[in-house]
Every structure is written in C-alpha cells, then in structure tokens.
Amino acid sequence: MKTLSMTSLLSGLALFAAPAAFASSTTSIPAFEASISTAQGPLSPGGATILRSELRTAMEAFIYDTGGPQGVDSAERAYLTTRLNDTPFQQSLTGTAAKYYADFYELNDATFTSYPLYQGSVAGTAASLFGATGPLASNADIREGYIPNGQGIANQATLGTAFTTYFEPPVGPFQPITVKELIERLGTTSIKGSTPSVDEVEGAVAYITQISRNSNRLYVADWTCRRCSFSPWNTRGYVIAAVSTDRRFVRMVSVWTADFGND
C-alpha cells in the first residue's frame, strides 16, 4: 500500500470533512429537461429517440455544477424515480440509453453513506495479469476487495471514498460505461505520450470484466492529484471499477495517464 504524503492526506481529509455540496434540483431538473428536449429536437442525430450519448450529457446536470462534482440529492432522486417509471420517456430511449439510465439511477442512490469497501493489492503485476507489456500495464495500479456481508453495497459514495482511501488521489464522480466504452477508454487515452497496445487493451478488458461479466456493472471516473506520494509532479488519470452481481466485490484499475507540473 502506498504511504500517503501529508499534503494529499490533509487534502483528502478536508474533502471528506467538508459539508456535502449538491446540485440544486431547482437548476438540475430544468437543465436535464432542456437537454432532453434538445435530444428529441429536429437537429438531433437520433430524432425523437434519445441516444446514450445524449442521455449521458443530460444526466450530468445531476452530478456536476459550476463548482465541480456534485451528488444526487433526495429531491433529484425522487424526480429520477418518476422518470424511471415514466413509460413513454423510457420508450423514447435506445436500449443502451435505457441501460445507462438504470445504471445511473442505481449508482446514485442519494445515500451519502460510504460503506466499508476494502481494496487490497492483487497478486502479480499488471503486465502478468493483462498478458502484455506497454504503457497501460506500466501505469496501472490494481486493487480489489469486498464490502463485508450485510454492511452495504457499492454506491457512488462508497466507490469514491474507497478509491481515495486506497489509491490516494481525489476522484470525480463515477459514471456507468459499457464494455465498448471500456475498450475505447483503455485503447484511445494517451498514457504519458504513448498509446496502449492492442494486446494490453484486450488483456485488461478480459481481466476487468471477470468481475462484471454477469453483473454488467462497469464504471469510470477521472482523478487528479497535487503532489501525491507516488510522484513529485501533479498527476492525472482515470479509474475503472468493475462491480459484482451482489454489489459487494469491486475490482479497481487506476491508470496514471499524465504529469502536468509541480506547483
């Protein structure tokens, strides 16, 4: 396990100690509805049908505000429940868009309790687990573990807290992804100026989806860190979380993609 630097540790404690700030339903719901109207407008590539990419953009109103990442509060959750049970609305979504809505709704449960998700280092290097060497394997940190039976499930708060606790960097909100989107993220994101090899990507996808194959629960989040203990530089990257069917076992693969200064 990494030894946390005092700067990053204090930053993390401040993050968790600060009062939770949430996107107000008075602004997020109208913003969502406006995006949906645009997605069903004459200039939309899907016409009256809402595409997954359009829905994802619309639903960001519930987790982002001008101040940064925000959480889904109880009023927003009630609205999302109404829309989940709105048959005409659900029928206007493509199949993958409907899956995104359901996954987003499940993850962002307006329960701001972080359940005890342990993340321990795995046996073997990323290269051995992916079956290939290259920039992806060289810059991947892999951990996995359980929430004890009866002590909760992997929701938004749990994933975020576990990542920062065991990997160190503060992290943005997790969002659902498909296997196709996982392949795109792993294969097209530059890692310190290099492109991952096909073998690395295929190996990583196989390894990650061992956990999510039956559950179809895959999530991605971006992270940045100011002078984390593992680098004298400011760093950034992303993390993939694969969650089991019972939402208790989680495998996380964090990828360090770039340095961007040491101020």
Predicted region positions:
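Short, charged early-sequence alpha-helical segments and their helix-coil boundaries
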Residues: G71-R83, Q90-D103
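Structured segments of extracytoplasmic/periplasmic soluble domains
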Residues: A61-P69, R83-Q90, F104-L107, I211
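Exposed beta-strand-loop-beta-strand "reactive/processing" segments of non-cytosolic proteins
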Residues: N216-I240
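N-terminal "domain-start" segment
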Residues: S25-G41, L51, Q91, T96-N216
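Carboxylate-dense, calcium-coordinating segments in secreted/extracellular and ER-lumen proteins
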Residues: Q40-S44, L51-T82
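A short, surface-exposed interaction/processing loop segment used at functional sites
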Residues: Q90, G95, A110-T125, P232-N234, ...
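Mature, folded catalytic cores of secreted/periplasmic enzymes
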Residues: P69, V205-I208, V255
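Gram-negative bacterial Sec-dependent N-terminal signal peptides
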Residues: M1-F22
